[in-house]
Amino acid sequence: MEDNLPVNVREYQELAKKALPKMAYDYINGGAEDEHTLRENIAAYTRIILRPRVLVDVSKIDMSTTLLGYTMRSPIIVAPTGGHKLAHPEGEKATARAAASCNAIMVLSFSSSCKIEDVASSCNAIRFYQLYVYKNRNVSATLVRRAESCGFKALLLTVDTPMLGRREADIRNKMVFPRSGNLEGLMTTDDHDTTNGSQLERFARATLDPSLSWKDIEWLKSITSMPIFLKGIVTAEDARRAVEAGVAGVIVSNHGARQLDYAPATIAALEEVVRAVAGAVPVLVDGGIRRGTDVFKALALGARAVMVGRPVFFGLAARGEAGARHVIEMLNGELEVAMALCGCRSVGEITRSHVMTEGDRIRSLL
């Protein structure tokens, strides 16, 4: 056991900032434009107060939950973030092993720096795959087939990126993204010309399809048997349309605040989406989760599970596979403590009555 291990996500972030080149750190940590939503994703959690119940026998805590019939040790999923080789030479393979050792589902990014096949063969685990639909539909279709043939269990379609958000740190740094193993043989990411700013931004303009619409859900369903989640839902209107489209679940996400600045913080949008879905499909949430108490708050507001991206990346950058694993373990440990101190023996016992939101406090004064 190493001495002086980080004891929270913030300390891992500080280590990652020291370990990474400025361009890489700014890429993973940055947000869109003024970064208001980036800050708010985290700050919104601080405005939710816990309401603990006491004199409950919490000698045994069960954090397990299920999603699509798969049992998870806890409701914490590793979110899709691109370019893990920016953080560690083993990239997503190291992250996959870390997740598997914690019995956590990992979602592999479309922008993975490791091949789908290499990640799949790195360890035995339940994995999902995150997809963008590109102008060249054959690229997306090929990736779906590869993921399905490698045993991935679900598809997460990102729906909030008809074009890339304006990430000013990447523009300023003239961000150059590493070769993506996912896209090898399909299209190139080798153009390193940064004359006009971010190479990533230029690549996205050339490939992302701004014409993507609800009718494309049917196309995607026609080419795969994997259940489909829509990632990037923040309104009741879109949540209801997602259910009508027959998807398997929705993910309340603002793309880590990297797309539209001044979009709502995800935890602030969660309850609206949960109410609109009305139990028809599971609702997941990502963005801003830095503590086990944040996970608890999301579950209390109706999320089936949460997805955590940047913290795992920070762990990978700071200490490799061991760091990524430790971040997941820390969050699990914090969640267990929060459950015990709130009188919840299982995630099923976490209810809306265990939290007070800012809106609740305002309504109580009327």
UniProtKB/Swiss-Prot annotation:
A 2-oxocarboxylate binds at residues 27, 132, 167, 258. FMN binds at residues 80-82, 109, 130-132, 158, 231, 253, 286-290, 309-310. Its main location: other. Keywords: Fatty acid metabolism, Flavoprotein, FMN, Lipid metabolism, Oxidoreductase, Peroxisome. One of its GO terms (molecular function) is FMN binding. Pathway: Lipid metabolism; fatty acid metabolism. It is an enzyme of class 1 (oxidoreductase). Its cofactor is FMN. Belongs to the FMN-dependent alpha-hydroxy acid dehydrogenase family. Homotetramer. Binds to CATB and CATC; these interactions are disturbed by alpha-hydroxy-2-pyridinemethanesulfonic acid (HPMS) and salicylic acid (SA). This is Peroxisomal (S)-2-hydroxy-acid oxidase GLO4.
